């Protein structure tokens, strides 16, 4: 009887571990450790800090070419395209980031800002609703909520 219970306990423990791993992975919003090791990713971040959007686009294109599943790089590629006013390219990059990680807070926020810049408030509100479910008290949620609340069609939005 004890042998049966011990076997059952071990089996349940292994099953719990197997099921827990995907949940942890789905809850991981970024690839920070991996990105630190990518020179072009760092170059892209420096280009964004310097507002050199063309260089940022070039850098992040290289990152996603080498690592197409890097949601962070797709997100920052979208951000850089958006800063250049290339909204179709920006939305395509955000869509890729969100296909990889549907809970990517940065991509949800930045795409929402892009929708506001292109006078698509309903789409921005949809991104905001997703953010509220993921993390109601996060800075990304607060930032997009403020922008949506202050939105006036045709107004210039100061954030990139």
How should these model regions be labeled?
Residues 2-6, 10, 28-37, 125-160:
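Terminal, low-structured helical/coil segments at or just beyond the last alpha-helical repeat
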Residues 35-66:
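Alpha-helical segment of the N-proximal tetratricopeptide repeat
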Residues 37, 71-72, 105-106, 138-139:
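Helix-start (N-cap) detector for alpha-helical repeat units in TPR-like alpha-solenoids
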Residues 62-63, 96-97, 130-131:
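Canonical positions in the second alpha-helix
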Residues 66, 100, 133-134:
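Structural marker of alpha-solenoid helical repeat scaffolds
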Residues 76, 110, 144-147:
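Canonical tetratricopeptide repeat
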